[in-house]
Amino acid sequence: MMAEKHGVLLVNLGTPSAATPAAVKAYLAEFLSDRRVVDLPSWQWQPLLRGLILPRRAPRVARLYQSIWTAQGSPLLYYSQRLCDGLQARLGEAIPVVLGMSYGEPSLDRALSALSDAGVTQLTVVPLYPQYSCSTSAAVFDGVAAWLARQRCIPALRFVRDYAQHPAYIAALCQRIRCSIAEHGQPDILLFSYHGIPQRYAAEGDDYPQRCLATTQAVVQALGLMPSQYAVSFQSRFGREPWLTPYTDETVVALATGGVRHLQVICPGFAADCLETLEEIAVQNREAFLAAGGHHFAYIPALNDDDMQITLLQQLVAATPA
């Protein structure tokens, strides 16, 4: 009887291959063509996307990527790969750990093929999204299922839906917050900013808002925060339909005009720092808060390649299915 071989697939959203308009256009075309992300009929959406949105949006977004690009390239890819390498070191060579991206490279197909070539018969898939959403976690499931559908022999599959309340995740977030307070002092308000989704997705059954609330409540309980000491908002809205509210960009301005002088912001939904945290929050929202009368703004970095996040992943992989 052939021995079972375990393997791990870590999945993040993805990133352009370069901070250029052409690379950003190619990445956004793939990302925004996923029906899990934008569910409009293709005949309606694709002409709008390719004829209007991408030509206008790609050059502007490329400039934003250029502002966060490092010598290592994309921060999201860099930290995701370091997470992968760190987990590989913890688990040992007998259990291959491979990184894949839903969009861009390294692709899911490439990552799954590498695990298959390594002889993996028991596969654990960990989307690096702490809070489940149909537009992120479910998109990973779709991508994995599409690859499996083309195989003659498929591995036993374990899919980690999310880890919004996992004790190791909550402990890591609390440690990040404590470090920020030690560096910057006690804020008037700690703002939890999550990536938004269209309100319609939640109305149709996506429990993402509840998962964000679960994370927030676990953290504030662990830190002993009162309701007057924190707030929750949703960022990165796209398009014209209503998204989850309150919106982060409006919230930081309202807090400043309402008398908040010291604001610290954490984005628990991002496992690795990326454009939405390093530019949208740490630059755009900081400027908006200060312009509206705020005095001190601090962005609390994502968990990135911190040992506590590697420990979290190790525990997620080791956990037995419910």
UniProtKB/Swiss-Prot annotation:
InterPro entries documented for this protein: Ferrochelatase, Ferrochelatase_AS, Ferrochelatase_C, Ferrochelatase_N
Residues binding Fe cation, per UniProt: H195, E276
Signal peptide from the UniProt entry: none
Annotated catalysed reactions: heme b + 2 H(+) = protoporphyrin IX + Fe(2+)
GO biological process, one term: heme biosynthetic process
GO cellular component terms given for this protein: cytoplasm
UniProt pathway annotation: Porphyrin-containing compound metabolism; protoheme biosynthesis; protoheme from protoporphyrin-IX: step 1/1
Annotated GO MF terms: ferrochelatase activity; metal ion binding
Record's keyword terms, sorted: Cytoplasm, Heme biosynthesis, Iron, Lyase, Metal-binding, Porphyrin biosynthesis
Keyword Cell membrane: no
SUPFAM superfamilies: Chelatase
The keyword Cytoplasm is assigned to this record: yes
Enzyme class name: lyase
Pfam families, sorted: Ferrochelatase
EC number: 4.98.1.1
Localization, UniProt: Cytoplasm
Family: Belongs to the ferrochelatase family.
Function of the molecule: Catalyzes the ferrous insertion into protoporphyrin IX.
Descriptive protein name: Ferrochelatase
Origin species: Edwardsiella ictaluri (strain 93-146)
